[in-house]
């Protein structure tokens, strides 16, 4: 990609919205609305209302790389761009395609400058005006996300990414004397937030304000940036510490999500000023002109997010620790996708707490930030699925609405510094005024002292005169009072003598009245107690009567339910017995070879081609007895009979479950109801050969489903099947066990675990039986295992010798390659061809004599597909060709 260096954006007046400097394809930024009023108290002046702003999404196509030019030379691109219509066509095949519209479509020839002006510049301008902004890149591994965002452009200035160009515009627009720009550079690696500028700080905690919901990282390193060179040096340091790995899709695949946080703090000029004048008594005055209101600053944040690429394990070839990294990346991207879906569908609940990535991007999607998303895709048709997923992510993101808000705060620090200067001036002025006041006070104090002394002398003379006058009046009043007291002293004695008899009578009456009151109160209390006791006993009697009636009703109900359950159990036992007899009769008919009637599905399902060849019943025909029982009784009751203490009931129940498991429609219901766990428990605990045989057959039927195969492995099914095979003597039991293991051998994901838990050795151990049916199932299992190994080796997912050869299966394969039984011979021939396809097995093929069998198969095999496979294997293997030339063998 090429392009000229982006010109610095000229400064714009604060508070005025600006248009994007991009060309005709760039979109116009929505109006930010009027600035909030600076009036009112408090420490925050942020706007409470916001402007709705949709997430803007652009798609960028990466040109073909060298590998794609070589591998896809005969194929066209899977995408077709229509940039003039802002549309993208995704081809499903040569005839069908789907069209998607985006805010901008960038071809593989789009320059870095063009990408910046379309995607990031409107967001950067919003950040300079005081709004939060987010620029994010999303896409598959190796599609150019880091190139788009984090390219430093040291060798080619035209290749500079969004991070470098955004900082150039920010530094060009701010005023260094009043504005500040600070940077933090982080990575989210394995769900841990690590500081790329300080690698020691490798587990930073996320702090969420409980009042506003804002997310912050107080432990992250924050570096103030003054010039572009220091910012580029910081990016270089951060990129050196970022985790990367070599995968099949990208030699320098980022294994973490990188977040560049740019905090911009700008002062807003105001005119809130007031004159304050201070005057002294002597006429001197000092005036202070300043703003009593703190200055307003706008704080905004630009977040540039370089997401790690989503990848499929089978395509990237991740393994070991790289596999764990890929799992963590996919989990966090999955959580982000869930949040985008919830926001796009206006869901009441958005699961932002499912991942640290979604918590960090909480403000970017559905929050208050202006967000631009660039989705990067590749042209290769091999990655059509990943390209489709990326495009659909961008389509859903376009439905997300953010409420953009302007954040202004009072700058109390600046106000404090200015007030400190004013305070120093006032202190000096105060000292001058204080000296003047002290001198004036001394003069006034001296004058006042003289006046006080004269007033005290005059007051003292007046006080003496008044004192003498009042003393004489006091003596006269005392004499008058003494005379009145003597007169009144004689009157009370006469009054006491007259009132003594009356006082004694009143006292006796009062005592009698008091006693009567006490007796009356006691009687009333006793009567109330008796009433309460009578009421209490009446309530208890009524409650006891109601309880007796209730218990009688419950007893009658329980008795009737017991009778119904006994009758139902008797009916179920008779139905199970009849069905078991029918199944046994059918099985005996099958053993006799008459071929009439429907064979026992549980055992027949071991051979998938036989089961598929049976004609299905007509929808209007009568249902089989098993289906009728399943509808009438219910699966849960049938499974509960597996734990019956009566052996006959348990045998019949497991046969019914085995027949139900033969139908694919019933398998999911059996597993959900716990049937698989119950069957494995029977293998573990039962000593009855019949129960273990039928249980193994039911497990074999369930093992036809890939989901059930994972559950069987997770619950130790292979170990239980191996143990059953070692204890069994009946060939039919061994046939069922071998069939179950053979079905598990057909799963690519389970091969290592299957071998580790003894599955292959259990198969080889069952060949001692010698029964043709058992040998046919063993041969089928070995053929399935060899086919999966061959497919994995072809895809590059497996190296090294075959696990079958390591476990000693090759001698038995060679020995039975020309078996008289057609099913055994067909599976053995197929297994031998798949083993020989992997070059690393060639020496063992030769040493065990399997080369002659391959030559025989290529000449005499009755099936043309196996014969051609053997021929291609012999002609494509250099080792086998060399040995054939040595032995003078011709194909």
UniProtKB/Swiss-Prot annotation:
Residues reported to bind ATP: 139-146
GO BP terms: cytoskeleton-dependent intracellular transport; microtubule-based movement
GO cellular component: cytoplasm; kinesin complex; microtubule
GO terms, molecular function: ATP binding; ATP hydrolysis activity; microtubule binding; plus-end-directed microtubule motor activity
UniProtKB keywords: ATP-binding, Coiled coil, Cytoplasm, Cytoskeleton, Microtubule, Motor protein, Nucleotide-binding, Repeat
Region (Disordered): 1-54, 586-626
Encoding gene per record: KINUB
Family membership: Belongs to the TRAFAC class myosin-kinesin ATPase superfamily. Kinesin family. Ungrouped subfamily.
Short sequence motif D-BOX: positions: 370-378
Domain description: D-BOX motif functions as a recognition motif for the ubiquitination machinery.
Record has Flavoprotein as a keyword: no
Compositional bias ranges of the Low complexity kind: 45-54
Designated name of the protein: Kinesin-like protein KIN-UB
Feature: compositional bias, Basic and acidic residues: 586-595
Compartments where found: Cytoplasm, Cytoskeleton
Top-level taxonomic group: Eukaryota
Coiled coil start-end: 502-592
Compositional bias ranges of the Polar residues kind: 607-621
ARM repeat feature ranges: 623-662, 664-704, 706-746, 748-787
Domain named Kinesin motor: residues: 54-400
